């Protein structure tokens, strides 16, 4: 069970890192102000002391609750989830996960992002098959030495 949680965490973390390097910020809906786009990209505009948020308060709470639910399912510990959700906004990974959740909830994923989700889903689903084949081969190799 702990191995499955680690695999799930690595899947989500790798998805966030991969999307941050793929530049999906170009696909963000145009209704987000430029200042918010700069925050999502991890940059701060010069001369702006206050930067507007990309989402409204209710959307932010919904996204945080969805993210906390996801992390609770993966880790099964509310303490870990609370720290990750509350401290996460300081890191770029939280923004990418938030972006993914928004895109999934609005079904606006397209192009490279959708392709990445398909690839990661296929890889994620193939892990048990690969492990099963490896265990099967290992069992037969070990049993051939015994006989």
Swiss-Prot record:
Endpoints of the signal sequence: 1-23
Keywords for the protein's UniProt record, in alphabetical order: Host membrane, Membrane, Secreted, Signal, Transmembrane, Transmembrane helix
Keyword match Signal: yes
Localization: Secreted; Host membrane
UniProt membrane topology term: Single-pass type I membrane protein
A single Gene Ontology CC term: host cell membrane
Transmembrane stretches, start-end: 117-137
The keyword Secreted is annotated on this UniProt entry: yes
dEER, short sequence motif: residues: 58-61
Subunit organization: Interacts with host transcription factor NAC069.
Family assignment from sequence similarity: Belongs to the RxLR effector family.
Free-text note regarding domains: Has the canonical EER motif, but lacks the canonical translocation motif RxLR, which characterizes most oomycete effectors identified so far.
Function field: Secreted effector that inhibits stress-induced relocalization of the transcription factor NAC069 to the nucleus, thus affecting its broad role in abiotic and biotic stress responses.
Protein name listed in UniProt: Secreted RxLR effector protein BLN04
Encoding gene, per UniProt annotation: BLN04
